[in-house]
Amino acid sequence: MGISKKTVVQSFALIIIISIVMSTTEANSIGAPAMREDLPKGCAPGSSAGCKMQPANPYKPGCEASQRCRGG
């Protein structure tokens, strides 16, 4: 039992339709500004000497045992 002529024609038609749709789509590429390193707002990429990023969660040391802040 072989593949019917109808199935072969439908397969070729589907391949042609898919290739037409894929060739006519417009794809926008991601430019270099989207992939550069993060800079704070208002800082130019060339003059970032005065634009230092602040840490999101600065280090805060834990408390002493004498302060009894951890149930101790």
Swiss-Prot record:
It is found in: Secreted. GO terms for biological process: calcium-mediated signaling; regulation of growth. One of its GO terms (cellular component) is extracellular region. Disulfide bonds join C43-C51, C63-C69. GO terms for molecular function: hormone activity. Residues 1-27 form the signal peptide. Keywords: Disulfide bond, Hormone, Secreted, Signal. InterPro entries: RALF. PANTHER family: PROTEIN RALF-LIKE 15-RELATED, PROTEIN RALF-LIKE 16-RELATED. Belongs to the plant rapid alkalinization factor (RALF) family. Cell signaling peptide that may regulate plant stress, growth, and development. Mediates a rapid alkalinization of extracellular space by mediating a transient increase in the cytoplasmic Ca(2+) concentration leading to a calcium-dependent signaling events through a cell surface receptor and a concomitant activation of some intracellular mitogen-activated protein kinases. This is Protein RALF-like 36. It comes from Arabidopsis thaliana (Mouse-ear cress).
